[in-house]
Amino acid sequence: MHTKFKEYLEKTNFSKNTVESYYFAIEQFYQQYGDINKRNLKNYKVWLIENYKPKTVNLRLRAINCYLDFINKSELKLTFVKIQQKTYLENVISEADYNYLKNQLKKDDIDWYMIVRFLAATGARVSELIQFKVEHVRLGYIDIYSKGGKLRRIYIPKQLKDEALTWLANRNQDSGFIFLNKYGNRITTRGISGQLKKFAIKYDINPAVVYPHSFRHRFAKNFLEKYNDIALLADLMGHESIETTRIYLRKTSTEQQELVDTLIDW
């Protein structure tokens, strides 16, 4: 039955990671509890809550519920745990640290300077960033289609476009992927994440705030500070719901601390 469930997931266009994650949850349940029944399912949920973060708990429960639908036992489906929404943004690179990193890289490593610039000035996810080609820079945007066929257009601001075209001309590149590794192949998302951590250490910046998605957060924060249109930002970020974008209206924990220190004198 487990194998058939895995085959079902693969045919239903779930991503490889989701298939593996769901299959792992089912294996985990059967190894610990053996039989599918109401009591065992509740015990499994309690065990998950005691051992994992809420986000992981809900991922496992989603897998279990999917499996219960598959075996026609939907009446046993479990409710998800409520995730307390944080009132602040965590681990977002500050404007000062971003500018410092950007300026250091511009002097020391122009290729990595451009990676950081593109991340922060386009709001691209790192998986989207590595798809940029010279042709997209010339156009001033890239169109990316999700698995569901939804179009996401990522714009390249004119200032960045001009800078990138000069950079590409200087290295005599007129086509193909623009972000390459030392072997001349398209760089990987893991390669970007790992090298950014090294730069954080080199330039004495907190490594916790130097990772690809941090620059996407920086893009959103800066955008709202300059142009307070959350609906437009949601479109630019490729968010399905505007509620996802609302997090950027919040302060970072550091900004909250600074405000408290400044405002409260009683």
Annotated model-derived regions:
Residues M1-W266:
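Conserved catalytic core of the tyrosine transesterase superfamily
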